[in-house]
Amino acid sequence: MAENKTLKIGIAGSGNGSQGYARALGQVERARVTAAATSNRLAVDLQRTIPGVAIERDVGGLIRRTNVDAIVFADPVVDLPAVIRRALLADKHVLATISSPVTCSQLDELASLARRRQRLLMFTEERSFHPALIFLKWMLSGRSGLWQPRYIRAVSAPGTGNGNNSGPSIAALIVEELAICARLLGENPASVSGVVCRVEAEAMPAAAFVNLLYADGRVASLQASITEAQESRQWALATPSKTVLLDECDIRSPVKIVSLDSETAAGSPLRINPPVPLAEWPSESTVTPPLRSTDTKVDQCRHFVESILNRDLCESNAAFWADVALAWEAVQESVRLEGMPVSINAVSEREKRAVGERPKLRLIRGKGMGTVDARKRPALTLVPR
């Protein structure tokens, strides 16, 4: 695209996510919100803050607009894969939030469609832009074996309390933690096990406990709860000589390193949070991480916009989320088996067989019946009149 190209973006949704992304896009250079499919309340706010923005009654109208290059789906959408497919077929780039689990096969199909249409399909990963998690990922990807964790523990709670329906579901929380864990370690586990607990027998799950076992022996334990009154997003990564503690909700000192080596008194925490650029952080042995104040929504939007303008379609994370979805499907199977470990490879092979099997197209003619292979799924039955 031309260097002075401005990306015209449409916003779909009426919740806080859409409002937040509309404001974030206003802070990104070479990006302009030109249309939105939203409620009257948010429409009034957008028209007040973004002069000239067009308002559509539904997502279909937004997708059909010729003055929209990309669409952001930041709020829960009914049948998200179908809506994304419509947008890609209309040659729109897509940034979407996975508010409820999407299957591995659906994500694979969408990724393939995006490649064929030469459009960028990206799913939001706001927490991956958190400066503390960026530091942690950088530290774990270093050459020093000192920072290779043998055990990881994550605790997540949105702080909605009482398991009400105003916040994310247990499924959404676990899927998000699976994604962060995959980003930190750079791979999917070999096997998983999971259990859920309910306050009442017929109630939705109030908490979940998931264990991940990796091929090299590393173990990760993920815990999620929707019954706690206080928000919590904490990580603990244990190495042979140090434990890294990360609290995403701690603004002052999100990262602490508890060292057990001779240089530090046993068990004493090193609180680290000077806001310095990554390039100025001299080595892994120091305790000064590259933390800086940031707006994760703005960073997410900037990454999306710059990838499109640079025609860098390889920045799509659809394949990554397909791997996360595969791990989630294994967790679901383990829950159905009351916590028994489930192999990721076994789930993957079943997924491939299910996708590869073609159903039969049954053509009924009078009293006769014949079958031929169908090219589309699901199977069709035709009855001539």
Name every feature range the model reports, one short phrase each:
Residues 78, 101-164:
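A contiguous active-site-proximal alpha/beta segment in oxidoreductase catalytic domains
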Residues 57, 96, 121-123, 246:
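Hydrophobic residues in well-ordered beta-strands that form the structural core
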Residues 1-50:
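N-terminal Rossmann-like dinucleotide-binding module
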Residues 161-230, 234-238, 249-250, 319:
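Rossmann-like dinucleotide-binding domain that binds NAD(P)(H)
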Residues 91, 118, 217, 338-339:
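Glycine-centered short loops/turns at secondary-structure junctions
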Residues 50-113:
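Beta-loop-alpha module in the N-terminal Rossmann-like domain of NAD(P)-dependent dehydrogenases
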Residues 241-319, 340-344, 356-385:
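C-terminal glycine/acidic-rich active-site capping loop/insertion
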Residues 35, 69-70, 151:
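Short, Asp-centered acidic motifs that coordinate Mg2+ and/or phosphate
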